[in-house]
Regions:
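Long, contiguous, secondary-structure-rich segments that constitute the structural scaffold
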Residues: 355-414, 500, 510-526, 532-537, ...
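Non-catalytic terminal/interface segments that mediate subunit docking, oligomerization
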Residues: 139, 241, 573-575, 579-642
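Cofactor-pocket helix-loop regions in the catalytic cores of large enzyme subunits
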Residues: 1-171, 180, 189-461, 465-470, ...
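Hydrophobic transmembrane helix segments
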Residues: 184-186
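Mature-region segments of soluble proteins
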Residues: 451, 471, 628-629, 708-709
Length: 774
């Protein structure tokens, strides 16, 4: 596990109640590591090598779950071949983890079951972040820990409803519920929204010029399947099928320093619910902010994007209500939902997020279409408008449930969430099962998939030991029926308890339902049924599956090979800026990416430009601070939370700091290969080794040594300001998600003079400066 602040309570409870063994793998010795039975300190950016080293030991000793692998997985043989290279000695050289600790970790994992793997941003924020998030589930598949209580993979979020916002796909590459951007997905949504598809798509521009490379359309990753309306006729490409700009590189849509592919330059930035200073490459964001036509910030507190540039106009700050002034449902990392009741109405001039968007839609003339989906319902197995007005947030919640078949939101209605909230005392805290009254037999918050209102929810994904009616399921059939002549369906020995179908079977569609389920549909059912379980508003497919005890998405094998990706199996690749030039030659990064999220991205050309470690010899990464979230703009406006962390700092090993003449609590400069720098307080700390430093990412208000606090609107300056780590984030992005490489960069440090301005605040103990002196 990494350093999941949100999971600390559960970790300690597991140790106390179940004598759970805790292994912490983290470049920094965290508070979680202090409670570990075994601590592995790997070099930043070597997680894949570390896990392959563990897999090597497990397979060599025959500790893998052979039956699970045989019946429920595909491609583990390829993992086995790759793991052969990662002997304990090779793994130790690359990661820095001693051989004896590798052997001990593998032994604990193999002989202490079930076991779960927990991670947070330390895994995702790398140029190999996607591969990182694949290798850990592969480890769990090899150990047979998937689909079991106490097993699986658990991603700990930094605050509430991250899972909910993920389900809503607040991204530029998919419609909500992971439907993607295909025409079929747009048609499905238009039907659910009650709007005409042919009229709707006229809102999108059609490009007649297609960038080409070597005479063929540019295509790098699986997600670029959305690039073309028709791959054979790229001149007919439609922007509705294109990914937009990513949060990591949106600024290139303004600056256009790299090759960009868009119908026009970005001119307006609307920021709502996002601490933009928690994004990488803040100097680029600052430059882009000064060139935009307009910036709109809809936040409860002043988002620091508002003060980054010195522009005197074109910035609009809309006061938006806090969580305590809003109502609706949220989703946790275990996929359970929970109703949040409004404490007070929005104060002063603030409005709820939805009110802001409603006003925006009215101003631009599409309000009626915007809210029509909340007026829809299912009548006689067909979706149609059933009311003239809507009730917020209940009808919005029900709209999500009605449309969200792809992950099984059908049973997650507003009525259900309110009912569960009123019966908190009737749920078992360990199993989540309702033990009495009107919630008996339902799991708390109906963790998705909850296929319809009769389904109890799914507390543990892929658990074959429970029947459909109790939340059981196999692995989803999503990637075809066979690959290279090998069936992608589960073996005949892998049958869901109570299922009418023995062994594996494909996802249920209109075309195959009669054959797979052994039923005969009426002509009326055929006419009203959607093309597949994920696009069926009628509910007929779910109903027929329920009768047979069959999960509608199929019963397949978990694939270790993603044949559409640049790396079909995860492979160790050195960070774009690596401290090991020798390993860069053995484990280079990806080739440069001609196009992803509307912009080209450097990989190998940046990594191979020179040995970056000669000028920037120190590895740096981020750390999470318990009392600060995201950009920290909420907590830094609280006097008491600010008192806990009154200044921006970097943890530096005393040996490293003194090498540069930097004493404990001195100010220091941190320089990046991008030519940027930040000025922060040096904290001598043993949590890091002499070759690396780490620091939080939750500050703003100072930019490369310059105090920006005078730019805050009167009365809105936080109690604490400071440099943002993200000013010195190294160049590096994941080729699939384009997430930035926050956690494996290089830097150099030097001593700095004290600030001539204050970064601290007043509290009841008197005024303190940044040194903490009275």
């Amino acid at each position: 596990m990494a350093n999941p602040v949100g999971g600390m309570k559960h970790t300690l409870q597991a140790k106390d109640r179940n004598n759970a063994k805790v292994i912490v793998a983290d470049p920094n010795f965290t508070k979680t590591a202090a409670h570990a039975d075994l601590y592995l300190r790997q070099r930043s950016g070597t997680d894949i090598a570390l896990v392959y080293g563990l897999i090597h030991i497990i397979l060599k000793n025959g500790w893998e779950d052979k039956e699970f692998i045989e019946n429920r997985t595909y491609g583990i043989d390829e993992i086995r071949k790759e793991a052969e290279h990662w002997t304990p000695e090779v793994t130790s050289d690359v990661t820095g983890v001693p051989v004896d600790k590798l052997l001990k970790a593998a032994d604990i994992l193999a002989h202490t079951k079930p076991g779960t793997v927990v991670w947070a941003l330390g895994i995702t924020q790398h140029s190999v972040g996607t591969s990182n998030t694949r290798i850990l589930p592969i480890l769990q598949l090899i150990l047979g820990n998937m689909g079991k209580a106490g097993g699986g993979c658990n991603i700990i979020r930094g605050h509430d409803n991250v899972q909910g916002s993920t389900d809503m796909c607040n991204l530029s590459d998919s419609l909500p519920m992971y439907y993607g951007l295909t025409d079929a997905a747009w048609k499905y949504y238009c039907k659910g929204w009650g709007v005409d598809y042919d009229e709707f798509i006229k809102r999108f521009a059609v490009s007649t010029k297609e960038p080409k490379q070597g005479g063929t359309p540019v295509k790098n990753t699986v997600f670029e399947e959305y690039y073309y309306h028709d791959p054979k006729h790229p001149e007919d490409r439609n922007w509705r099928n294109e990914k937009g700009w990513s949060l990591s590189k949106w600024w290139q849509g303004v600056l256009k320093e790299e090759n960009t592919f868009s119908s026009g330059a970005l001119r307006v930035l609307w920021v709502q619910g996002t601490g933009l200073t928690s994004m990488a490459h803040l100097a680029k964001i600052q430059e882009a902010a000064s060139k935009l036509d307009m910036i709109v910030v809809a936040e409860p507190f002043v988002n620091e994007i508002s003060i980054l540039s010195d522009r005197k106009d074109g910035v609009y700050i809309l006061p938006v209500a806090t969580a305590f002034e809003n109502e609706g449902h949220l989703s946790a990392t275990n996929r359970s939902g929970q109703w949040r009741t409004k404490v007070v109405d929005p104060l002063y001039e603030s409005k709820g997020d939805h009110e802001v968007m409603f006003l925006f839609a009215k101003k631009f003339g599409f309000y009626d279409e915007y809210v029509k989906g909340m007026k829809m319902g299912i009548v006689d197995r067909e979706i149609k408008q059933v009311k003239d007005d809507f009730v917020w947030p209940d009808d919005a919640t029900n709209e999500i449930a009605r449309i969200g078949n792809s992950i099984g939101y059908g049973g997650r209605t507003a009525e259900m969430f309110r009912r569960h909230q009123a019966n908190w005392d009737k749920f078992d805290p360990d199993t989540l099962i309702g033990i009495g009254g009107e919630v008996k037999g339902e799991y708390y918050g109906k963790p998705w998939p909850a296929w319809d209102e009769k389904h109890p929810g799914t507390p543990i994904l892929y658990d074959m030991s429970k029947p459909y009616a109790e939340g059981g399921s196999g692995f989803r059939n999503r990637f075809g029926l066979e690959h290279n002549g090998v069936s992608q369906l589960a073996s005949e020995e892998t049958t869901l308890v109570g299922s009418a179908i023995k062994g594996g079977y494909p996802q249920i569609t209109k075309e195959n339902i009669e054959k797979v389920l052994g039923i005969t549909l009426t002509e009326e059912e055929k006419a009203k049924m959607g093309p597949s379980w994920s696009m069926d508003y009628s509910g007929i497919i779910f109903e027929k599956c329920r009768e047979k005890g069959v999960v509608p998405y199929g019963n397949a094998r978990a694939r270790a090979i993603v044949w559409e990706f640049l790396d079909p199996i995860p492979k160790h690749r050195e960070p774009v800026h690596s401290p090991r030039w020798d390993l860069v030659q053995k484990y280079p990064t990806f080739d440069d990416q001609a196009r992803n999220f509307r912009v080209s991205t450097k990989f190998k050309s940046e990594q191979q430009a020179k040995d970056w470690s000669k000028e920037f010899p120190i590895v740096f990464s981020t750390q999470r601070v318990v009392n600060l979230s995201g950009a920290g703009m909420i907590e830094r406006t609280s006097k008491y939370l600010s008192a806990i962390t009154p200044e921006m700092f970097a943890n530096v090993n005393p040996e490293l700091a003194l090498k540069y003449g930097i004493k404990d609590r001195d100010m220091m400069w941190i320089h990046s290969p991008q030519g940027t720098k930040i000025k922060v307080r040096c904290y001598h700390s043993q949590m890091v080794t002499p070759d690396r430093i780490c620091m939080p990412y939750n500050f703003a208000g100072i930019m490369q040594g310059v105090d920006l606090s005078a730019r805050y609107p009167e009365g809105t300056k936080p109690y604490v300001i400071g440099e943002s780590y993200n000013t010195v984030t190294n160049y590096g992005f994941d080729p699939v998600t384009q997430i930035s490489e926050f956690n494996a960069g290089l830097c150099r440090i030097e001593k700095a003079e004290e600030n001539t301005f204050k970064t601290s605040f007043f509290h009841e103990y008197g005024e303190r400066d940044a040194m903490g002196k009275e």
